[in-house]
Amino acid sequence: MSELLSVALFLASVLIYAWKAGRNTWWFAATLTVLGLFVILNITLYASDYFTGDGINDAVLYTLTNSLTGAGVGKYILPGIGIALALVAVFGALGWVLRRRRHHPHHVGYSLLALLLALGSVDASPAFRQITELVKSQMRDGDPDFAVYYKEPAKTIPNPKLNLVYIYGESLERTYFDNDAFPNLTPELGALKNEGLDFSHTMQLPGTDYTIAGMVASQCGIPLFAPFEGNASASVSSFFPQNICLGDILKNSGYQNYFVQGANLRFAGKDVFLKSHGFDHLYGAEELKTVVADPSYRNDWGFYDDTVLDEAWKKFEALSRSGQRFSLFTLTVDTHHPDGFISRTCNRKRYDYDGKPNQSFSAVSCSQENIAEFINKIKASPWFKDTVIVVSSDHLAMNNTAWKYLNKQDRNNLFFILRGDKPQQETLAVKRNTMDNGATVLDILGGDNFIGLGRSSLSGQSLSEVFLNVKEKVLAMKPDIIRLWNFPKEIKDFTVDRDKNMIAFSGSHFRLPLLLRVSDKRVEPLPESEYSAPLRFQLADFAPRDNFVWIDRCYKMAQLWAPALALSTDWCVSQGQLGGQQTVQHVDKAQWQGKTAFKDTMIDMERYKGNVDTLKIVDNDIRYKADSFIFNVAGAPEEVKQFSGISRPESWGRWSNAQLGDEVKIEYKAPLPKKFDLVITAKAFGDNANRPIPVRVGNEEQTLVLGHDVSTITLHFNNPTDANTLVIAPPAPVSTNEGNILGHSPRKLGIGMVEIKVVNVEG
């Protein structure tokens, strides 16, 4: 209703000003500004909805204040460009319409009415309401009800008798199981759901709407609110250290806790969270690649669900035979937005909707078949009678190719339980949320019926029942939840552990690299993750007088303040203010001691602007002084004009990537020498090993042969045509996720380059 009202007020404002207000520069500017704000708010809402499927939420607010670059956004570039172009077009059209009758005499009354209507349209818009509530949540000091409803459970279960299998289905919300809306989409898992305790109204709350947040909510009974973007939590060394979560209780009760997934455990700090809360046995992409039957059978995120669930079954079987008490948690990935993935063992690899194939629905149908097969193996085993099986979505689906169809339904998370000891078939329509999942499981296992803000849906009352405005209530508790992290409020002395890649200060530990914004009584950690901007881009958003401590590889800060370290991949510490003085110190000891020293100096805005501009230079445009192309640092030597077909820097060097260009091309500013040696230190990937690799300069071509290990080879070139471009053409680029960033499309790797040097032998 508010959406229609806001649009009506917007149109009324435009019409009244365009046809009645007449000519006045001030009123025109004011009205256009407010109407433009309405347009920006609604485009922001649309864009946020595209990324999150949940409007302008907490994650979007973080992104608006911390620029997002890098991983996982490739498939959203075109929509982003489209939105930007639409914004320019709408502003231009709006200005043209408002000035249609600019030659008419000015009328103050109509101008004022148009401006008030424009202000009303902004105030009534859902986007403004969502942003206002989020900003309020940042300003609050907490909610008195938090202390009333936050409850810490007993640390043990008396006399536990049941093992636990807990399956997180990636984005596998309950809406998919509506057979009227999506006929025969989930027949196998849907049949199992109908055999157990099925909780039909599990809502999603703020801070529980992505994978690690959903896991924290379901095990600790709290949303994932932190002083940094949630997926960046991989940089912390402990995760809600004060909380008692389900894994802690299970471990204290004699359970061996296992977690199995196909993606890398480091992503979003799942390894840190699980290790902090009772899990000693973790298996992700790195751990599984040495045990799975086919290590190359992977999707963009890791191993397919059929592989992961097969390994989970092996773990279940071995643990059951051992007779020890255990919990086995597993997380699928094939239903990850925006498209999903189809494993090769599914019987149904295609699901049509509206008369055409839909990739997301197809992935759901396939993944649920894999999950059902895993559950049926457990049910058919002699150990099911001692087992509780839980199936839940980690969060509602984000904007995938099925999302617009999901939004036409009443959306809820999936949560159902199959008890081998006490079969029970019932659909429970009690209002609840994902924070109640862990407490419900704990209740069944014989423990308390509460964890944090979560309550058992079998014997307690959910906050979703207590508060009609439960979403606003949870946002009001955000400061209370952030305080549970027990983050330090100051930094004076700190220690960098060079070998463990850690920094410690005020009793807290963080993984490197790390950026800290330091103010009175607050230290804000800004980690680097797959979904956050590189730290130098985050630093570029700092105000001129903001104090910072930046711990990163030396070459990343050298271009600004330490040119001598431009090729160093060691750790360095920089601190200061972007508009004032900065220092760079080389970490030259295994345990390096540092102190903060922020000088109260005069702010130089020219210096500030220069620092910001330099920080924002993209990697490929960075240039350094060197007599060779060093591939494990960003950029290229000053002599290089441009290059293509080369992937990002890694610790050892860079791969060629045919997705970025069929050949490696390095164009120099000046012609290469008439006669020179080309010294190449490199290795080959896959079928490119031990095969001739053409290397061209002008009309002359040599061949390079590389093995799987790094070697150095010298080629002799004549360059009579004064060519300035070096071309290397790997013969058989291999599509692979080897070394890839999670969620990125596979790279096509050919050769791995460590260093290329041109040695002039002319004369």
From Swiss-Prot:
Keywords: Cell inner membrane, Cell membrane, Membrane, Transferase, Transmembrane, Transmembrane helix. The keyword Transmembrane helix applies. Its main location: membrane. HAMAP family: MdoB_OpgB (MF_01070). Belongs to the OpgB family. GO terms for molecular function: phosphatidylglycerol-membrane-oligosaccharide glycerophosphotransferase activity. GO terms for biological process: glucan biosynthetic process. Pathway: Glycan metabolism; osmoregulated periplasmic glucan (OPG) biosynthesis. Transfers a phosphoglycerol residue from phosphatidylglycerol to the membrane-bound nascent glucan backbones. Its EC number is 2.7.8.20. SUPFAM superfamilies: Alkaline phosphatase-like (SSF53649). It comes from the Bacteria. It comes from Salmonella schwarzengrund (strain CVM19633). It is found in: Cell inner membrane. CDD domains: LTA_synthase. PANTHER family: LIPOTEICHOIC ACID SYNTHASE (PTHR47371), PHOSPHOGLYCEROL TRANSFERASE I (PTHR47371:SF3). This is Phosphoglycerol transferase I. It catalyses: a phosphatidylglycerol + a membrane-derived-oligosaccharide D-glucose = a 1,2-diacyl-sn-glycerol + a membrane-derived-oligosaccharide 6-(glycerophospho)-D-glucose. InterPro entries: Alkaline_phosphatase_core_sf, DUF7024, OpgB, OpgB/LTA_synthase_biosynth, Sulfatase_N. It is a multi-pass membrane protein. One of its GO terms (cellular component) is plasma membrane. The chain crosses the membrane at residues 1-21, 26-46, 77-97, 108-128.
